[in-house]
Amino acid sequence: MKEGPISSSSNFNHVPVMGKEIIQSLKELPSELTKQGLIIDATIGGGGHSAQILENFPGIKIIGLDQDPMAREAASKKLIKFGTRIKIISTNFADFSLDEQAICVLADLGVSSHQLDEPSRGFSFRLNGPIDMRMNPKEGSSAAELIETLSEQNLADLIYELGEEKRSRRIARKIKNDLAENGPYSGTQDLSYAIAGCFPPKQRYGRIHPSTRTFQALRIAVNNELGSLESLLLKAPNWLLENGLFMVMSFHSLEDRRVKSSFKTDNRLKVLSKKPIRASPEEIELNPRSKSAKLRISAKKFLT
């Protein structure tokens, strides 16, 4: 599949969700940790959360991770004033290893507003672009290649399991029939139109767009998002000092269920947020994306 143009980082606007809540949680750590501690920002994005942390805690250093080259470029520009207090690494957090210990690991999961708003990335069904959806546009197979290679049965299973889409069988049948009869879709809106046709007319204009769950499923599969999350949940507690915080922000139930279960069953961690922390009504009004966010926080136990 021919790639679309790689967008500039200049428009990479990452609005940090629940920034105040994250800063407040860090302020509740023992002062000896925040005076000179290390934080791992596992999904640095445009650098929004890291900037807030570095501004509020002058002694803290951050290692920021991101597999998206545009995100890293944008974060580098935003955070350049902090000098050696910030180090940005090109990697998926699932592949990261740490030789020292941190006071906090922060992961803001999912797709960023910029990735959704940039047509060339192929994440959005509202803006036409190549059916790509890769977090790293230079690695792996695109969503277009995925739907071409999967069987109808496997595609239906994927849409059902990763998108929780009840019409997965009908959607998969439509996609595979279209590909067989007409060849590849011209772009994301062409695919979205085909998906919407699998719904009754009255359901095509509801609060949730008909393509939402299918596009979510394809994106999760293309980027192995759940596999990467499982790896992070297993590895991150080992990176933490005693009392260090593990904060994970998720945006859909598949992620949140895994985070909740892992925090509850991992004997290295103590759950600090019995229920997920949600964005305030004021924040939701300013940043609608924050409405679906759930922040869970745990702390590293002292293990004898």
From Swiss-Prot:
It catalyses: cytidine(1402) in 16S rRNA + S-adenosyl-L-methionine = N(4)-methylcytidine(1402) in 16S rRNA + S-adenosyl-L-homocysteine + H(+). GO terms for molecular function: rRNA (cytosine-N4-)-methyltransferase activity. Its EC number is 2.1.1.199. It comes from the Bacteria. Keywords: Cytoplasm, Methyltransferase, rRNA processing, S-adenosyl-L-methionine, Transferase. One of its GO terms (biological process) is rRNA base methylation. GO terms for cellular component: cytoplasm. Pfam families: Methyltransf_5 (PF01795). CDD domains: AdoMet_MTases (cd02440). InterPro entries: RsmH, SAM-dep_MeTrfase_MraW_recog, SAM-dependent_MTases_sf. Specifically methylates the N4 position of cytidine in position 1402 (C1402) of 16S rRNA. NCBIfam families: 16S rRNA (cytosine(1402)-N(4))-methyltransferase RsmH. PANTHER family: 12S RRNA N4-METHYLCYTIDINE METHYLTRANSFERASE, S-ADENOSYL-METHYLTRANSFERASE MRAW. This is Ribosomal RNA small subunit methyltransferase H. It comes from Prochlorococcus marinus (strain NATL1A).
